[in-house]
Amino acid sequence: MSATDRTRELRSLLFRLRKRVKPLAPGHAGAPPEGTDPVVHELVYSFLVWEASAPLATAALGRMRTAVVDYNELRVCYPLELASLMGEGYPLAVERATRLRAALTEVYRREHGTMLGRLIDLPKRDARAYLEALEGVPPFVAARVVLLALGGHAVPLDAMLHGMLAAEEAVEPDGTIIDAMGWLERTLRAKESEEAYLLLEAWRKRKAPKVGPTAGAGPKRSSKVQGRSRGSETEP
């Protein structure tokens, strides 16, 4: 299929989605907890959406926020503990937890705290490169933070969204996710990218499987996670 035909299929799909689903709100991650860096908040939520869905991510984030005091505490959780907080049957829970913990740890090392607010003032290309270079961060997560937290031009894709688009012949089925993201960002104007992504997430919301509501989260902890002091400023 030619690039022109592929573009036609993409725009036809987006046109149909506008009639079938309501796009998610740009702020569907919810407001960050008081005192929390909003970019870090979007980073954590983006990890939960990756290869899952927005409803699953929202539920998991609620459980995590009940169980820990702040996002810095997530950094010192063990991966299995983090995975249990996400909820029973959460997709790729252990891998997701391992990646999230690695990313938060590297943010802490680079910034001397769990904060990414300085990315707001960086050129968007530099901010995206920073996020993509963090250990454990999938391209989807970096692109989503750039799009929704930093106001940059990006069309986040993971394997699930890529497969959905490929089934509609809206992206090259044999290409990589990186290639598809690049093509989408060249094909859609900057002002179109946010709506397109939010439509795709609303579409995924209808298709994604649900997981059980239970999790291994206990009452909110006040001082320690698995024997580590929450207030410590040293590396785990």
Cite the ranges covered by each PLM segment.
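N-terminal polyanion-binding entry modules of DNA glycosylases/AP lyases
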Residues: 1-121, 189-236
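Short helix-capping and hinge/turn segments at secondary-structure transitions, especially at repeat
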Residues: 22, 66-69, 105-113, 132, ...
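A general structural motif at alpha-helix termini
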Residues: 61, 75-78, 86, 123, ...
